[in-house]
Structures are given as structure tokens and as C-alpha cells.
């Protein structure tokens, strides 16, 4: 047990010296290579241990550490850092997660440093993504419909109307007027000088470089080494010995099972019409939709509190850090998911947040809120990440 604890300690204490030099991290190719080499070396040390002498706790620790180390090596082998883009997220839009209330002067100065680091971050990420495009690893063009909203909204005429300026609109009351004015002036300067030009570069990169070279094929298996990569994702997400075909067959079985349940419900509620009619009813009847963003948030908060009260019945240890229920920021809402959990570090005084997307209310049915809340807040990601 001592030996495996030593390896766990080595993994937890790994320091990326270059990453620590920038508030947004280092995205140079060497960083990913060095980390993969470190994990591969540690994995070999781990595999050399005599597991037959392990007790249950040691075996669990071994399995988990091996799983994490192996995934780090596999991700580098497939160069996943060359493709940090999804239909609802990207290297640039993830910056919005850093926009939080400023609680004191120290946090404000730290946030200003973060904003100043955005140009370097954008340049490094663009370089990596260009490598992915050249290697045929880009995302399919079809997923980028409406994607311009993820960068156009940050190209503002003034600093004050920029989303990244919003934390300075309400500064802590303990700051003096002079301190507040100084911080706001510094924020305006860095947004005009660094943030807005950086997002102009993002716009140019996507519209002049990425979109013209995006692939038309949708499936990742149609990319170079794509079938092997897809299998690696099956291995990671299921932790089972499955194949694409076996998962597809399970999916068909689930579709059949769920469809039967839906048909039973239609009969149970005495709905007059076909399944297509029932689905249309669920998607269009006003009774299932909030009329205002505030109504949707209120409903989500109500469900969250009902889930909170059930936690002690099922979990012995609960997190001390609370979570709030808040709307997805307008800057990213149009291309964002229905909800998301935004965590925070244990050292931070900030709470976690369960974000609810209040954009396009006709696409946000109230009956989806219970499962969304249980997944994103409790007993889902907040409970999981705060312990």
C-alpha cells in the first residue's frame, strides 16, 4: 500500500512549470508531450507492482490510477488537444466560465491578469487546432450552424458593454471609490487592448481558416485513425469490453423498450392520437413551458430544493459548499446546452452553480427540469465534485 500511495502522491503533485506561468495555462505542444511522458512512465512503475499482495483498498487505488494514467497517454496518442471544439463549446467560449463576481481587490487584480492572458491563449490554441485541421481531425462543418454567436458577442464597440467587463459593474462595497475607479479603468483598457482584438482573431480564424477546411463527413470513424479513436472512447466511457456494433444493438434495444413505455403512457393518460401527435403535444402545448426566464429559474430552484431534502437519506457525507441556480450567460446561451454545472475549487469562496438555459424558452420544457437538475446539481455533479 505504501508503494502505490507514493505513486498516487507523485501523480497528484505533478507540476507543469509552464502552465503556472500563465493565468490561463500553457498550451504549447511540449506541455502535452511532457505530461503524456510523465503519465506513461508512472504507468509503467504502477504495472510493475505485485498486485496479488494488495488488499481491497489498494486494488481500487491501483485500478483508478491506472485508468487515469492510461487515459492521459491515449488522449495524447490521438492528439485530442488538437481538437478542443464541440458544437456547444470551444477553447474560446470556455473562457466565459472564468467570469465570476469579484469579492475583493485581490480577486479583481487576478481577473485582470487573466484577461491580459487571453491573446496568448487564443494564439496557442489556434496553432494546435490548425495542426488538427491539417491532420484531418477537424469537426464536421454541420455542427457550426449559429457558432458565430460564440465570438461575435464579445466583439463590442465599447468595453462597458462587453461580457468580460460585467464583474466590474458591481465591485465589493469595502473598496474605496478611488480603488473601484482604478480597477474599472484598468478593465476598460485591457478589454479594448487585449480581449476584443483577441475575439476578432477568433472570428477570423473560424471564418477564414476553420470553416473552409472543416470536413463534410460526420462520423469520427471517417477521420484518420478514427475507428481506433472511437473504440478508445468506448473503452473509456463504458470501462467494458464493448464494440461499436454491440453498443448500437443495445441502443436499438433501448429504443424499443422506451418506445413501449411511451405507448403505455399514452394509453394511461387517455390521449387521443398517434405517438407523433403526442410528441407534438408535448413539444407545443403552453402548459409545459415557462412564459418568462424567471419562471423557468424558479421552477429549477424549486426542484433543486426538493432534491436537496432527500440527500441525507441516501448519502452519509454531504458537501459543505453550496450551489446556486443561475441562468446561462447571454454571451453563450444561444449555442449552449439546456443546463450545466459550473464547479469551483475547494479553496474558493465562490459557490458552485447549476446553470439553466433560459434562451429560447419554447425549447425548454418544464418536464425536463427534474432529470436535468438531478444530473447537473444534486445528487449529480455538484455532489460529485464538491466532496
Protein language model features and the residues they cover:
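N-terminal maturation segment of proteins
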Residues: 1-387
Amino acid at each position: 500500500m505504501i508503494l502505490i500511495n507514493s505513486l498516487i502522491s507523485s501523480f497528484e503533485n505533478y507540476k507543469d512549470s509552464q502552465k503556472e506561468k500563465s493565468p490561463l495555462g500553457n498550451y504549447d505542444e511540449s506541455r502535452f508531450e511532457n505530461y503524456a511522458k510523465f503519465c506513461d512512465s508512472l504507468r509503467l512503475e504502477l504495472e510493475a507492482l505485485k498486485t496479488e499482495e494488495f488488499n481491497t483498498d489498494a486494488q481500487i487505488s491501483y485500478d483508478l490510477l491506472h485508468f487515469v494514467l492510461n487515459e492521459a497517454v491515449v488522449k495524447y496518442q490521438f492528439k485530442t488537444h488538437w481538437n478542443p471544439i464541440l458544437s456547444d463549446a470551444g477553447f474560446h467560449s470556455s473562457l466565459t466560465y472564468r467570469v465570476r463576481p469579484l469579492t475583493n481587490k485581490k480577486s479583481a487584480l487576478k481577473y485582470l491578469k487573466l484577461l491580459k492572458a487571453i491573446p496568448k491563449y487564443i494564439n496557442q490554441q489556434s496553432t494546435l487546432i490548425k495542426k488538427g485541421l491539417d491532420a484531418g481531425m477537424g469537426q464536421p462543418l454541420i455542427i457550426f450552424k449559429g457558432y458565430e454567436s460564440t465570438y461575435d458577442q464579445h466583439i463590442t464597440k465599447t468595453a462597458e458593454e462587453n461580457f468580460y467587463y460585467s464583474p466590474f459593474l458591481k465591485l465589493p462595497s469595502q473598496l474605496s471609490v478611488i480603488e473601484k475607479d482604478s480597477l474599472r479603468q484598468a478593465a476598460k483598457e485591457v478589454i479594448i487592448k487585449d480581449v476584443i482584438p483577441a475575439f476578432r482573431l477568433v472570428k477570423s480564424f473560424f471564418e477564414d481558416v476553420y470553416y473552409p477546411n472543416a470536413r463534410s463527413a460526420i462520423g469520427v470513424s471517417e477521420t484518420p485513425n478514427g475507428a481506433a479513436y472511437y473504440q478508445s472512447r468506448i473503452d473509456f466511457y463504458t470501462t467494458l469490453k464493448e464494440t461499436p456494433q454491440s453498443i448500437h444493438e443495445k441502443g436499438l434495444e433501448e429504443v424499443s423498450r422506451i418506445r413501449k413505455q411511451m405507448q403505455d403512457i399514452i394509453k394511461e393518460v387517455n390521449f387521443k392520437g398517434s405517438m407523433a401527435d403526442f410528441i407534438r403535444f408535448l413539444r407545443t402545448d403552453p402548459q409545459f413551458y415557462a412564459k418568462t426566464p424567471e419562471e423557468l429559474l424558479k421552477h429549477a430552484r424549486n426542484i433543486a430544493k426538493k432534491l436537496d431534502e432527500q440527500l441525507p437519506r441516501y448519502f452519509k457525507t454531504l458537501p459543505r459548499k453550496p450551489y446556486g441556480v443561475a441562468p446561462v450567460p447571454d454571451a453563450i446561451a444561444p449555442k449552449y446546452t439546456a443546463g450545466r454545472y459550473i464547479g469551483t475549487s475547494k479553496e474558493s469562496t465562490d459557490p458552485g452553480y447549476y446553470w439553466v438555459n433560459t434562451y429560447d424558452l419554447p425549447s425548454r420544457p418544464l418536464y425536463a427540469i427534474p432529470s436535468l437538475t438531478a444530473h447537473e446539481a444534486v445528487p449529480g455533479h455538484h455532489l460529485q465534485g464538491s466532496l
